[in-house]
């Protein structure tokens, strides 16, 4: 398994490097990367999720679906609680503490997690990784969006409306399909599957393009960023692996969950850090460094997780 993960991570890193070169050469600018992001989040990801739910693995018991979703949500909350004492020990300022705890708790399950699970575990991995989507969205709303906002008179209705994205809707539809046993077949399934093939390369190209416009050297000079990456990509997912060992679940299911939980810092941390002026430099650089070191941390983490599980 570790060798397979390393091979897939290297392939994804090569795709990321291609995006980096395209960005450096000016072939894809920020506007182009934003357009690719829209296609990925609003078209390719939803098609990928629905196609996966229509596969053979869509026959999993619905009770197991609920348990896996609860496991994701529980881990997000547990990671948040575990990092708060660490932030206090480090005597971080309020904004730094907020970014620190949320960076460690919230993995990039979308851009990195689902493509990586798909590459390593196939259709089964897509389904298991996609079950993190509604949980991650709920966590983002309750623990990130509400925490990062400074003003108290915000429009709750508008915030709830912002959660109605194609990706979230498709994740809910996937859960309904798993509960009812209904599947796409024939031409519709072929269409969804064809569009789904664009997920992995597109997501890696986007990350590479975004990295090309960032100060990479500066990111490697901050000790606090290494601690965030260590906790986010190694310590927290391995804690989850120890807990999952006692669930009695299928080993592949546990490994896939751990893989999602071991991904780099979610890009939304940088977005909200900049938008609400909550330690924006730390937020952006934590996302950047964890992505840069992912080709090292992910294979190492999965190598250890295999032995735990």
Where are these regions (language model features)?
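Alpha-helical transmembrane segments of multi-pass small-molecule/ion transporters
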Residues: 1-309
